[in-house]
Amino acid sequence: IVPWHIISETFGLSIILVPVLEDGSINLEVLEKTLRKAKGRSIISISHVSNTIGFANNLQIISSLIRREDTFLIIDAAQSVGKIELDLDFENSFLVFSGHKVYGPTGTGCIIGSMKNLSRLCPVFGGGDMIESVKWENIEWAKVPYKLEPGTPNIAGIIGMGEALKWIQKIGIETIDSHLDSLTKYTLKKLEEIDEIEIFKPGKKHGLVSFFMKKKNSLDIATLLGSLNIAVRSGYLCAQPIVEK
């Protein structure tokens, strides 16, 4: 939600929060009513898979609610790319994900959309190789993707991210999903044996388990597990409103 707050403060746009249900899914009824009431260009921003509770939203159903040409869906797929097969129509959608979540280098990422929609985006930064011509009066941008990639790119990072995606393709998403499911079930089974632990949201978690220990500090627990070579993350998980709820 942070980027949307920045954009809202910069351009004076309105942010409307659509509530989620108990299982973590978007309230589709409220979303549909909100879209019907919206005037002018609208953007729906969702996470495909929640990075706090692991629930996956149904992208096909949400996409079907878009009935106007000036409404776009932006999908944060950082938690699902490389783990879940994706089949999307990008007529009114963009999909974004980060490189480090697909086992690639940090500082890399990707945006996927139709050439038509990507061409409508304005450059965020200025630099070389993004322009067709420069004059005193104006600038003519180069075609996509060049107009969105100014200056010297993170060449090593991009190559590393590409190799990471090839590695995922070689192993196969079905194999990865099956392995994650097995690890998740084992983790849940062991955690459920400890009375002091409360687990958030049972069900299909796509390799993600959130829990807390009653009367224990989460950072202390994470530090202890880290000393035992068990890597976990503590705190708000970049989703403070959901964790607090």
Regions found by a protein language model. Name each.
Residues I1-K245:
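Pyridoxal 5′-phosphate
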